[in-house]
Regions:
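Catalytic-core loop-and-flanking beta/alpha module that positions acidic residues
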Residues: 1-192
Length: 192
């Protein structure tokens, strides 16, 4: 059907970066590498400014919060006029704890995106190219903070701190710890 093809074309021509407003969710740290990884704190306005000058597609990138619903709203392509934002910004209510924010752009001029990872990452096996075909090079002021996982290996911790400080000397680095008095995580500022 034409409507279904339009939806598939929309999905294929839209770039989306999924982020969260929370850095201390036990569930999210457990999902994503069992507390061994990092959480990067970004300045949303700086990210949008950095992206705007690199893409000349149909629209500038924008950030929006995800809406969570219990019922999947399937469009009737002959009657409904759902905006594409509704389709790209709706997720199952079960994921509400993520407090997701998405940065979206439609039909970007991808020639301005990076294909090669920065030199400092070339020796590391950290990029899954099955998922990432291009990326947007961001200016250093986009990066405000790094949160290091509770179970991060010491050698990775040292590497991440070194890279973060080269990227942005003003970046704040936090070590996540388990709160001994409650079922929650705390971020403790790392003195460098």
């Amino acid at each position: 059907m034409k409507g279904e093809n339009d939806m598939e074309n929309l999905r294929n021509s839209t770039w989306m970066c999924c982020l969260s407003k929370v850095h201390d969710s036990l569930l999210m740290w457990a999902y994503y590498n069992n507390h061994k990884g990092i959480c990067i704190g970004l300045n949303k306005e700086a990210v949008l400014n950095s992206c705007q000058y690199k893409f000349f597609g149909l629209m500038f990138p924008f950030a929006a919060e995800v809406k969570y619903k219990d019922i999947l709203q399937k469009p009737d392509y002959f009657k409904d006029h759902l905006s594409w934002n509704d389709l790209l910004l709706t997720k199952a209510k079960a994921w509400e704890h993520e407090q997701e924010v998405r940065i979206i752009t439609k039909d970007p001029a991808w020639v301005h995106a990076g294909r090669n990872i920065p030199d400092e990452f070339k020796k590391e096996d950290i990029v899954d190219w099955k998922e990432i075909r291009h990326y947007v090079p961001l200016s250093s002021d986009c990066f405000e903070s790094i949160f290091l996982g509770v179970n991060m290996l010491p050698r990775n911790r040292t590497k991440i701190i070194d890279i973060a400080n080269k990227l942005n000397p003003n970046i704040k680095i936090y070590q996540m710890t388990l709160d001994p008095e409650a079922f929650r995580l705390k971020g403790e500022l790392v003195n460098i």
